[in-house]
């Protein structure tokens, strides 16, 4: 007698485990999930990717406390000592020595006195610069007389030119053993004699070379990729136009030449906070993300924008749209921690987020 064939019974569902590598590829806001590599992440808050693993973000230790908002941390690197100052937005803006830490309140510049001179803008650009007389700080803020510090004493810096009101100097840089300064809302540059921290300056107007208009935004320095002994100084406009020079003396055609002229995305802010040195290169924060100046010289805008921050370019672009007008954008290199940090001010002087 034939028996009907039994239909196979389904077994119980079985789970399968699958291992994924740690997200060492970092945050990815560029690719779709289907095309994303398994080592990338769509959310990566307070985790830092390394070559082989991800590490949780470290906490922080309070170094100094004071009244007001710190708008510039100023570091003096002397021959024998390092000192830390904070430029504070308070009832009476001031620069305070925070080297020793703890509760600090005595102004070394500004304050209610004021000491040395009054400060109406605590947002400084500064450089460390050496002369035969020692190591100095040179500071400008586009609102007050420039300042200098010799490791012991703060004083007003005398930077003169017949066409210059020195309080209009908003950024500075060191190139070819000279101090360079930019005048706000112009394309006027001023430079001092070699190994000189103050005194009579020479004006260099480069406005006729910029085809997109605007005004000076940043002064950067970079070293040639093929010749490590060749340095360049680059001037960036508010429209993202870059003109680079090489040489040592702008007053001599034989020792000063235009080396490059190209377009990048507009810088997110003026002055030094938008850029930082990275080895022989210089990185600049723009509406296209963080770009390499050396790469920008040799590639087009789209190719360069896909480089350093290619995976988070959309996030940075969205942040520029939402927060671009706020003070607090900054690009900071942390060599000891092997990190490059982009600070985005989501609420001025009170909240921010950082891409690392």
Positions of PLM-derived features:
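N-terminal beta-propeller domains
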Residues: 1-108, 168-245, 328-330, 335-356
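Beta-sheet-dominated scaffold domains
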Residues: 10, 221-356
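Trp- and S/T/G-rich repeat-edge/linker motifs of beta-rich repeat architectures
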Residues: 44-69, 91-124, 144-166, 195-215, ...
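Short alpha-helical segments and helix-capping/turn motifs at coil-helix boundaries
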Residues: 70-71, 78-79, 121-135, 159-177, ...
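Helix-rich alpha-solenoid scaffolding regions
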Residues: 108-120, 132, 136-139, 276, ...
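Internal, well-ordered domain-core segments that constitute the primary functional module
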Residues: 135-184, 188
């Amino acid at each position: 007698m034939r028996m009907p064939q039994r239909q196979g019974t389904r077994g119980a569902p079985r789970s399968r485990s699958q291992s994924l590598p740690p997200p060492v590829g970092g945050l990815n806001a560029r690719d779709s999930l289907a095309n994303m590599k398994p080592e990338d992440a769509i959310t990566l808050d307070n985790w830092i990717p390394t070559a082989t693993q991800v590490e949780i973000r470290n906490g922080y230790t309070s170094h100094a406390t004071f009244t007001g908002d710190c708008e510039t941390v100023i570091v003096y690197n002397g021959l024998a000592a390092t000192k830390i100052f904070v430029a504070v937005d308070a009832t009476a803006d001031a620069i305070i020595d925070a080297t020793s830490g703890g509760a600090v309140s005595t102004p070394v510049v500004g304050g209610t006195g004021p000491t040395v001179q009054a400060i109406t803008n605590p947002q400084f650009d500064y450089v460390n610069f050496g002369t035969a007389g020692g190591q100095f700080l040179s500071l400008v803020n586009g609102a007050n007389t420039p300042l200098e510090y010799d490791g012991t004493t703060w004083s007003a810096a005398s930077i003169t030119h017949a066409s210059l009101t020195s309080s209009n100097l908003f950024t500075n840089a060191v190139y070819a053993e000279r101090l360079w300064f930019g005048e706000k809302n112009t394309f006027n540059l001023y430079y001092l004699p070699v190994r000189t921290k103050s005194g009579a300056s020479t004006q260099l107007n480069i406005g006729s070379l910029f085809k997109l208009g605007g005004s000076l935004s940043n002064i950067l320095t970079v070293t040639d990729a093929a010749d490590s002994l060749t340095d360049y100084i680059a001037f960036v406009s508010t429209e993202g136009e870059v003109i680079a020079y090489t040489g040592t003396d702008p007053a001599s055609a034989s020792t000063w030449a235009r080396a490059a002229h190209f377009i990048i995305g507009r810088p997110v802010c003026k002055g030094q906070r938008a850029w930082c040195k990275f080895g022989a290169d210089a990185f600049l924060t723009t509406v296209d993300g963080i770009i390499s100046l050396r790469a920008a010289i040799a590639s087009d805008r789209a190719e360069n924008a896909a480089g350093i921050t290619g995976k988070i370019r959309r996030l940075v672009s969205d942040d520029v749209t939402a927060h671009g007008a706020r003070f607090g954008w900054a690009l900071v290199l942390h060599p000891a921690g092997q990190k490059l940090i982009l600070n985005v001010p989501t609420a001025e002087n009170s909240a921010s987020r950082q891409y690392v």
